[in-house]
Amino acid sequence: MGQFTVVSLGLLAVFLSLSGAKGDNCPANWISRNGVCNKLFPDRKTWLEAEMYCRALKPGCHLASLHRDSDSTVLAWYISDHFKGAGHVWIGLRDTNRKRTWKWSDRTSTNYFSWNQGEPNNVQDNENCVHLWAPSGYLKWNDEPCASLHPSICQYKL
């Protein structure tokens, strides 16, 4: 009877880990990083359209926010490896008041920046949204007019 109990508990542990009971699994086609799930959507949208699209996916979903170099590296690898030629990709950072005060759409703290050299430059006083800059391998950011059309990357917390 003792071996049966041990085997049963072992099978239960395997089943729970495969079923996602640990709470760290993202849906198919989403990637997991630092407690969040991300997915790139290749359809080109304005920044606001992209943010609204993310919000419609599920409660708490927004354009991606990045808070450390490792976040940038994981997303850069994901985009470069799976979406060749995606072009620039919207993230959730923007200057809503046009005062060069950058805020994430998910309202997390703005404690990390990865601007490309010379950015943000606010060309023609019209660049208030931020994308991952394709020529940098998606590691650096550029400010851009919010009406520009780009793919986007959505994110939600696990």
Swiss-Prot record:
GO terms for molecular function: carbohydrate binding; metal ion binding; toxin activity. InterPro entries: C-type_lectin-like, C-type_lectin-like/link_sf, C-type_lectin/snaclec_domain, C-type_lectin_CS, CTDL_fold. The keyword Disulfide bond applies. Gene3D superfamilies: Mannose-Binding Protein A, subunit A. Expressed by the venom gland. It comes from the Eukaryota. A motif (Mannose-binding) lies at residues 119-121. Disulfide bonds join 26-37, 54-154, 129-146. Mannose-binding lectin which recognizes specific carbohydrate structures and agglutinates a variety of animal cells by binding to cell-surface glycoproteins and glycolipids. May be a calcium-dependent lectin. This is C-type lectin lectoxin-Enh6.
